[in-house]
Curated annotation (Swiss-Prot):
Name of this protein: Protein transport protein YOS1
This protein's encoding gene: YOS1
Organism: Saccharomyces cerevisiae (strain ATCC 204508 / S288c)
Compartments reported by the entry: Endoplasmic reticulum membrane; Golgi apparatus membrane
GO annotations of cellular component type: COPII-coated ER to Golgi transport vesicle; endoplasmic reticulum membrane; Golgi membrane
Predominant location: endoplasmic reticulum
Impact noted for substituting N18A: In YOS1-1; impairs interaction with YIP1, blocks ER-Golgi protein transport, and causes a severe growth defect at 37 degrees Celsius
Purpose: Required for protein transport between endoplasmic reticulum and Golgi apparatus.
Transmembrane parts of this sequence: 2-22, 65-85
UniProt KW keywords: Endoplasmic reticulum, ER-Golgi transport, Golgi apparatus, Membrane, Protein transport, Transmembrane, Transmembrane helix, Transport
Amino acid sequence: MVLFGLGRLFYVILLLINAVAVLSEERFLRRIGLGRSNDETPVFGQDQNTTKSKVVQLIGAVQTLLRIPLIGINILVIVYELLLG
C-alpha cells in the first residue's frame, strides 16, 4: 500500500518537473510577468529577493540543470511502463 503511494508521488513530481522544464519564456512566462528581463534590475535600496525573482530563478534553474537528466528519467519511465505497466 505504501509503495503504491510512493509510485504515484514519483509520477506527480516527475510530471510537475517536466511541466516547469518545458515552459517557454517567450510564449508563456513573459505574458504572466515571470520572464527574465534586464530592465527590472533593482536599484540601490530595493530588495532583490522578492518572491517573483525567486520563482524566476527556480524556473531557470530547473530548465538549465534538469533538462538532460529528465530525458533519461522519462525514457526509463516509458520503458518501465511499456514492459511492466
